[in-house]
């Protein structure tokens, strides 16, 4: 069954696995996610579950949003997100999803908006190499070089150039959940995830093929300190 939840990125830290290897992890506070709507094939043409995350005052919503929450007797939520599922049985409006929906050893896909870097050159944005710094060249060391050939006599579309970097919605697939603190609603996810600290993350069971041999995870007694 597909698992999903919405969380907030706290930051990164390090933990030791059962073999004593140091492992970088991202601390994610997944909070109390409430089912705000259930989509069915008969009514909507597809199956999905909508979750709400984070509190917000009524003045931060438009009229249609406020009426939606009042009609369903729900508290106002800052973030709403639909997750496609094959079967909606077991989900109902008001149902709460917490960190204990996952367990250590699960693989997840994490989606979020990346950090905005502003206008960036090709070296930072596309990992280009620098130009030679010898033979009198002093003002083009970070240039991309020629942007077109003599034959077409024009710049072709799709070339890698400087421009706005970051602030894009991306998904990182097949990340390992190292530990779950159900009491504090915290997940430890191996490696880095997109988004700045305190950014919203959308977490769901991975669509990638799961390896047969899982890596060793953190001891169950490991305590997680929240900032």
Swiss-Prot record:
GO terms for cellular component: cytosolic large ribosomal subunit. It comes from the Bacteria. Residues 129-154 are annotated as: Disordered. Keywords: Ribonucleoprotein, Ribosomal protein, RNA-binding, rRNA-binding. GO terms for molecular function: rRNA binding; structural constituent of ribosome. One of the primary rRNA binding proteins, it binds directly near the 3'-end of the 23S rRNA, where it nucleates assembly of the 50S subunit. Belongs to the universal ribosomal protein uL3 family. Part of the 50S ribosomal subunit. Forms a cluster with proteins L14 and L19. This is Large ribosomal subunit protein uL3. It comes from Endomicrobium trichonymphae. The gene is rplC.
